[in-house]
Amino acid sequence: MGWWQAIGALTATERLAALGALICAAATVLPWYKAPIGGLVKTGLGSFGFAMAAQLITAGAAIALLIQVGRGRRPPLPLHVGALLAAAGFWAGGIVVYLMFDRPQFELAGFNQDYALAHGIFVALGGAALLAMAGLRIRHVERVRERRN
C-alpha cells in the first residue's frame, strides 16, 4: 500500500493530526521574525538551529506514524497512537514557545536589538495545537474502545 492510499485510510481525526503536523513543517518557510526597522524578515529556515531541526523531526515522525496507522499497523502496547500524537503536538508547541523567547539578534551600526515575532511562528504554534488536540481526541476514542472490550 502506498503512502497516498495510507492517508486515504485514515479517520477524519487522524487526518486532522496529519494536517497539524504538515502545518508545523510548512510554517518553517514563513516569516518567523521581523526586524525592528526596514521590514526585513527571517524565516524559520533562515534561523535554522537545533530547535528547528527538532521541530521538523517531530512533525516528520508524526506523519510517519500516521502513514503506518493508515497501512493498518499500530504501535506495540503500552504505546497508543493518540498519546504519541498528543505528545508530539505538545513537544512541537513547547519548541515553538522556546523559539518565541530565543529570538535572533538584529545588529545595525553596532546596536543590537531582538527581532519581533512575525506570523509564521504563530502558524507553527497553531499547527502544534492542532496536532495535540487531534492526538487527545484519538486517545479518547481509544480509551472508550478499550473500556468496551
Residue spans for each PLM region:
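Compact integral membrane and secretory-pathway proteins
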Residues: M1-N149
